Amino acid sequence: MRVLVLGSGVVGTASAYYLARAGFEVVVVDRQPAVAMETSFANAGQVSPGYASPWAAPGVPLKAMKWLLQRHAPLAIKLTGDIDQYLWMAQMLRNCTAARYAVNKERMVRLSEYSRDCLDELRAETGIAYEGRQLGTTQLFRTQAQLDAAAKDIAVLERSGVPYELLDRASIARVEPALAKVSHKLSGALRLPNDQTGDCQLFTTRLAEMARALGVEFRFEQNIQRLEHAGDRIAGVWIDGKLETADRYVLALGSYSPQMLKPLGIRAPVYPLKGYSLTVPISDPAMAPQSTVLDETYKVAITRFDQRIRVGGMAEIAGHDLSLDPRRRETLEMVVGDLYPQGGDPSDAVFWTGLRPATPDGTPIIGATPYRNLFLNTGHGTLGWTMACGSGRVLADLLASKRPQISTEGLDIFRYGKHKENHKHAHPAAAH
């Protein structure tokens, strides 16, 4: 059975790999010259199931209003006049209740924990190398109020059986020795020992090599124009003016997925959350982080690779704009300089931006659609690297008519209600 996978980020590539392992003939198509050239290229480097949390949370609307007035705010909104932006923000606000937060976080943790286990299994079986570390994640609280507010997340961790450790100020240096000199700036920390780190772009490149060895064909620099449908099935994909056909189709185009789905009458509430990163060469390994540190105040992650520090964060709701805002670089430099002043020189860093495909409830969209042979694997937000292996494996099981190893409740697009309308004559501009 032939499967056409649209998109070669970490999620699309993981989908292709697990589909090939399940015995499918797989072709991957992407507009870029190689895998992981967009959102997966320079993300924060975290594999953090325990910190899988929706942006839509109680108190966020009030915080967002305050953030709009702050120079180093973790969230910024640039109104584009796009109706989809307004609709997405309205849906997000509806998910900012305690009840919705608990449901959404449970779904995200369920998939993220499974995905981490799939990554462990993959690494044990294949020896795939991607500058990975299995040393946990430490969330830093600069105020007692932040430390107290962590109670709701700890409750979810306990219900999900996720190990954690609450650290006082003096204990933080035990897991992150370089923070000893700045411990006076901190009130405490929450450590998740089972979280991991690694270079997502390097992982995706190596996984693509393994997928090729299983027979997967990658076609790069090809322009995906639109999906052709006939009744309740996809008849093919128009790529550079030619109709490509397969038995099954997997859409893994991240933030560009809605553009391909809307003409089919499928409204996928996936909107780009623009993020930024700095990749800083390490100057003193002893003064650099050991794993990943999360600064709760600025929502910035600082991650250790072999000879580099990856500093990632921010969220801009600003459409598909990929311009680099120097103010965001200033924030990232400020945070890493404040916590690790001797770890590396931010002036030598590489500054990057990417678009995270976010849903209003934080949970990705994985599985079937109203079209019998079209499947989705998109909407992972800031957790594409964390969720990639599990999402790919779940998707492969669904296509193979196997029962996935975890519950898929609440993961497919049908949680948003009716999605199929009649759009006979809609032909969008090329999305990917």
Curated annotation (Swiss-Prot):
Its EC number is 1.4.99.-. Its cofactor is FAD. GO terms for molecular function: D-amino-acid dehydrogenase activity. It catalyses: a D-alpha-amino acid + A + H2O = a 2-oxocarboxylate + AH2 + NH4(+). FAD binds at residues 3-17. Oxidative deamination of D-amino acids. This is D-amino acid dehydrogenase. The lineage of its organism: Bacteria, Pseudomonadati, Pseudomonadota, Gammaproteobacteria, Pseudomonadales.
